[in-house]
């Protein structure tokens, strides 16, 4: 198979072709035991669902974390950025899953059709747009699809070797469902080793546009934890892939990686339980005040956060 230099670099250096690590057979059970033993006696909001957003909120400010737990945020509504992101991932799904090669424009159009059919909120947003606004979003999806195809080997042609899966929702239920840890993977590559099941053969990739942020590494570690709990074996590597430059930040998964992620889940469960008992949240001002539902009444809120975020977004 003929590949360009960027495609070959992604295949050889990120996806990799070398030996994969083998993990102990009891790894998933030890992770589960660590979490369940730490939180079993807590008064949890039941069920307590934790994903990357809530864990990141806790790392910023307990007040923001509590507001999300309490469902205080207004109902989600699509905007240009969220709609573009949804269509971008759907277009990549179309490209990878198609029987025949598709050009980026066709993939983008199919992504719209399928998303309108499957997601009511997106359909309402899309129907309310003018034709020029729809065209503008579609062209951004086309651009991102071109960047993806120029960065990765042709996954459609490598389905047998890499078993690509896109937009894969996963969750791990703990304590009989009282605690649920979940995530959605942009791209999962690799097939299980049937002869040696505890060999880690998968890589989980989060597709990104824009700049890198510190929380991306923690997000990926959480994905590794949920995969380990769900499938019994973790991925060998997790990565954030930046489409504009064809670059990535990756981390090879080790047991320490997984137990670190498990400890973040434990910390969040303990925080949720103690605030449920009446403890006041620890308040930390920052850029997140711009989107916190409690900003107008919070004594620690940064009054200039919204203005700064708006300036940074327009820069």
Task: Identify what each model region corresponds to.
Residues 1-15, 19, 212-217, 227-315:
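Metal-dependent nuclease catalytic regions and adjoining charged, substrate-binding loops involved
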Residues 90-167:
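A non-catalytic, helix-rich entry segment at domain boundaries
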